[in-house]
């Protein structure tokens, strides 16, 4: 079996772990910032095409302990890189080190690169490797002196679904947007609303989840070009994903924004995601938000003081939005992502639950309101 590592934003590990288990992979282990699992070659494709909240899919080739450069070099050189990287393959190296003796990332990059060059040169009988072929990105991590050597099977991050042709300022990554939808326990039955929709990411991810449409169907992945991987696994994984999609259901998914240009972009993105028949976008003022019906949920990412608005303007916006939300039935659930430390005071309500998340490098809280949480 092959071993995989799926890095993710801090706070999303359990969601990614649940996704991996649902796909049927073995030995799933959740760690800080990543999920480890085991599977077959076909799971390279299945993970890449189906994961909503993971950052990327890494193929783990080796794990060992190293506290000096010689051990790092020998451990790297012992890996059968030639089983994966052909003689013309390009293999850049990147990585990170946390709480480890080998703390200099550039030095570790150099050592890993040198060891792989030596191994492949010996395997192919070459003094100089051309590196003119397809890319085989090597990624290493060193955490508490434990080294993990991987090949990046995704290429571009999994947040790049292929539907964001253009964006508005300060977009929310698709992986985090999908996580917000999942944390709201949206099941496709109740109305789903994002009153600060921007380029539509949260509502589009809700539509993909409601329809059980795999997020990676409209893009390509690095491992599709690997010579050592059977091309058929990608067709089979795509067929499996499309067979699992729901086609005969209707949903009430709505996004609103006060900026007409943002709404235009959101509609275009929904078309690219092939969910324009599932989600509706309108020009609307979030401070006047209202909705009929006894049940529903609001999941939204309003402007932070750190980005689009000055802090006082953001606070006034939170107050006005809070007054609008107060008019909803108590049976509604409301989820608001914000980095503002005084959000609850401004919003006018103490959250029933909070969850710490990161929007990129920005530390945030997901404020959750509702009796049915």
Over which residues does each language-model region extend?
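C-terminal edge-of-domain segments
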Residues: 138-154, 367
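Short beta-strand/turn micro-motifs composed of small residues
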Residues: 8, 257, 338
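A short, flexible beta-alpha/helix-coil linker loop
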Residues: 98-101, 157, 303-307
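Conserved S-adenosyl-L-methionine
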Residues: 172-291, 306-307, 311-315
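Non-catalytic nucleic-acid substrate-recognition regions in nucleic-acid-modifying enzymes
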Residues: 1-134
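C-terminal catalytic and target-recognition region of SAM-dependent MTase-like enzymes
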Residues: 285-288, 292-373
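SAM-dependent Rossmann-like transferase core, predominantly class I methyltransferases
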Residues: 149-185
């Amino acid at each position: 079996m092959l071993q995989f590592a799926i890095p993710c934003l801090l706070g999303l590990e359990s969601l990614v772990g649940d996704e991996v288990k649902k796909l049927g992979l073995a030995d799933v282990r959740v760690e800080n910032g990543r999920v480890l699992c085991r599977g077959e070659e076909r799971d390279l494709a299945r993970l890449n095409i189906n994961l909503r909240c993971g950052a990327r899919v890494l193929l783990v080739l080796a794990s060992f302990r190293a506290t000096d450069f010689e051990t790092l070099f020998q451990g790297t050189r012992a890996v059968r890189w030639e089983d994966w990287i052909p003689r013309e393959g390009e293999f850049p190296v990147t990585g990170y080190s946390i709480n480890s003796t080998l703390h200099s990332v550039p030095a570790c990059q150099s050592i890993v690169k040198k060891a792989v060059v030596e191994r492949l040169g010996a395997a192919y009988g070459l003094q100089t490797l051309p590196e003119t072929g397809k890319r085989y990105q090597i990624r290493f991590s060193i955490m508490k002196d434990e080294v993990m050597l991987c090949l990046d099977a995704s290429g571009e991050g999994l947040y790049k679904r292929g539907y964001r042709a253009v964006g508005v300022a300060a977009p929310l990554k698709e992986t985090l947007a999908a996580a917000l939808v999942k944390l709201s326990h949206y099941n496709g039955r109740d109305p789903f609303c994002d009153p600060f929709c921007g380029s539509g990411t949260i509502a589009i991810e809700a539509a993909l989840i409601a329809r059980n449409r795999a997020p990676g169907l409209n893009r390509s992945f690095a491992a599709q070009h690997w010579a050592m991987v059977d091309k058929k696994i990608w067709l089979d994984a795509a067929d499996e994903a499309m067979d699992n999609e729901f086609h005969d259901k209707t949903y009430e998914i709505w996004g609103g924004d006060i900026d007409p240009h943002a709404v235009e972009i959101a509609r275009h993105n929904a078309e690219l995601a092939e969910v324009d028949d599932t989600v509706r976008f309108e020009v609307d003022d979030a401070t006047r938000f209202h909705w009929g019906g006894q049940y529903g949920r609001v999941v939204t990412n309003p402007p932070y003081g750190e980005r689009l608005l000055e802090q006082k303007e953001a606070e006034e916006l939170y107050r006005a939005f809070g007054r609008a939300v107060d008019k909803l039935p108590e049976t509604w659930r409301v989820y608001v992502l914000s980095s503002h430390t005084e959000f609850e005071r401004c919003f006018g309500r103490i959250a029933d639950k909070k969850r710490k998340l990161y929007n990129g490098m920005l530390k945030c809280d997901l404020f959750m309101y509702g009796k049915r949480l």
